[in-house]
Amino acid sequence: MSIFQILMFAATLFFAFQIYHHVQNLEDKTPNNDTDKHGDRAVFATQSLVEEADDAYERGEIGRAKEILEEAYRLEPINPEIVNKLAYVIAKGGDRLKGIELYERSLELDENDDLTHNAIASLYRLERAYERAQEHYLKALEIDERYPQTYFNYGNLLVDMGETEQARKMYKRALELQSDFPQAREALLSLGDKA
């Protein structure tokens, strides 16, 4: 593996971790028209399960986090936060195709979540489904054109696709939006540019 590939892999892992933490902070977007005690208990139960899964994940217990999130998903299958966290943990555990399937489910619930588009694009990239990855990066940019990480990730994909000139543009745009973005600067340097 070349140094550039190692850097790109590290950047992908860093981004996946950022998504996981972002998902932790999302507010519950599910409709809650049912205010009976049973509904309140279910929401409380899933919130507790998600917190327990977060703790397990932070302790490095990915399998345990997955089990807990699967239980939360059974209780509340239309909660994008739960679906995204489960997708992330399952993909992190090695089943990227199941992770992709769950991210697709999450996008059915909320098609305008740019971070979910980023996450699924990263998995498609790892699976070498470059066109699908590109579709999701472009959708993420359409939703939020000011998020530098998307430009960086899209640049990485373009490098994989052999489109280095376009990749340069993406890395430069990432640096325009966030001047202290060392991974984007290193990626430009690896392409022969002065960052």
Question: Where in the sequence are the language-model features?
Answer:
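Alpha-helical segment of the N-proximal tetratricopeptide repeat
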Residues: D36-K98
